[in-house]
């Protein structure tokens, strides 16, 4: 399949979503990269069908950050393949990936991959560290490997019709033990 450009779109106030997304883009091996940073402003972008898109956003309270969702409204696909990435603060991403999937599909994208990564929580402090230093070197290496697998999937498809979508509902979420959740809630309340 002939895809030779990747459009990287991100919202990343603490830079963790940006770091993970950049690693995934590197892993694809595509060198023609267009970047849209939605952290400070909105953008109107129409993505052509033969362009891979990577969208990376943070999770706040188990959902895609509301401001990120607002700023993504101007992004439209034309049946374009998209990779969805949510970065959460080591508590839980809950239904954020499903929410982003519904949005991307409604905007005309074909979801071909989805991923969740841990980033240092925005409430993390020296006294109460929550995933400090994440994404770390191992996380970013895994993100690059994920990008390479996406490229393999694209290369294996004869055409867009054979670039099969992924059902993010089937991605197994890690179990959240009650004690760490309780400790987290105690710290932030």
Question: For each predicted feature, which ranges?
Answer:
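FMN-binding flavodoxin-like domain, especially the glycine-rich phosphate-binding loop
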Residues: 1-8, 12-39, 43-186
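Iron-sulfur cluster-binding cysteine motifs and their immediate structural context
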Residues: 189
């Amino acid at each position: 399949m002939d895809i030779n450009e990747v459009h990287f779109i991100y919202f990343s106030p603490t830079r963790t979503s940006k770091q993970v997304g950049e690693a995934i883009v590197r892993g694809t091996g595509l060198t023609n990269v267009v970047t849209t940073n939605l952290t400070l402003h909105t953008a109107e972008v129409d993505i052509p069908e033969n362009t891979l898109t990577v969208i990376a956003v943070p999770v706040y309270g188990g959902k895609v950050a509301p401001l990120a969702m607002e700023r993504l409204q101007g992004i439209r696909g034309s049946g374009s393949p998209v990779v969805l990435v949510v970065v959460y603060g080591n508590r839980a991403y809950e239904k954020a990936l499903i929410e982003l999937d519904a949005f991307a599909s409604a905007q005309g994208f074909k979801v071909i991959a989805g991923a969740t990564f841990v980033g240092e929580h925005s409430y993390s402090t020296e006294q109460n560290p929550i995933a400090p230093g994440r994404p770390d070197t191992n996380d970013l290496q895994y993100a690059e490997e994920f990008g390479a697998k996406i490229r393999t999937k694209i290369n294996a498809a004869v055409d867009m019709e054979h670039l099969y979508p992924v059902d993010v509902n089937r991605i197994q979420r890690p179990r959240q033990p009650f004690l760490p959740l309780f400790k987290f809630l105690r710290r932030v309340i």
